[in-house]
């Protein structure tokens, strides 16, 4: 991928459980931290904001972009990508974003797809497909 961003993290990494063989034993302090649930759960949500990429050349990438927030309330925000030339297998998708900008993007897409857009707010996607 030229860019891959996702808020759909793996919950197994966020909600750890102490293995049975360690119960009742002294464990490192950072394990205690990892085993402590985040309450309320909203405090544990990741936020991706204010991301800038420019002057990128990519050849034979699998996909140009996969960028997605979690839902209507938890979006990726303020992404600015410019001056990108790429040859890719497929275009990809942008979903649940706010203020996502693509400018001066030149794509050669093997499967002839275009970047799909889903539930984005105030986004400006300017792509020259070759």
Can you say where each PLM-predicted feature lies in the sequence?
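Extracellular/periplasmic carbohydrate-active domains that bind, remodel
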Residues: 1-130
């Amino acid at each position: 991928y030229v860019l891959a961003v996702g808020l759909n993290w793996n919950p197994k990494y966020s909600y750890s459980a102490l293995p049975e063989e360690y119960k009742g034993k002294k464990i490192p302090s950072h394990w205690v931290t990892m085993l402590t649930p985040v309450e309320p759960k909203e405090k544990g949500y990741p936020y991706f904001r204010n991301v800038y990429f420019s002057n990128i050349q990519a050849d034979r990438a699998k996909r140009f972009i996969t960028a997605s927030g979690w839902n209507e309330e938890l979006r990726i925000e303020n992404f600015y990508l410019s001056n990108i030339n790429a040859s890719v297998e497929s275009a990809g998708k942008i979903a649940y974003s706010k203020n996502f900008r693509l400018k001066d993007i030149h794509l050669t897409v093997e499967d002839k797809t275009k970047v799909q857009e889903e539930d984005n707010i105030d986004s400006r996607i300017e792509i020259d497909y070759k």
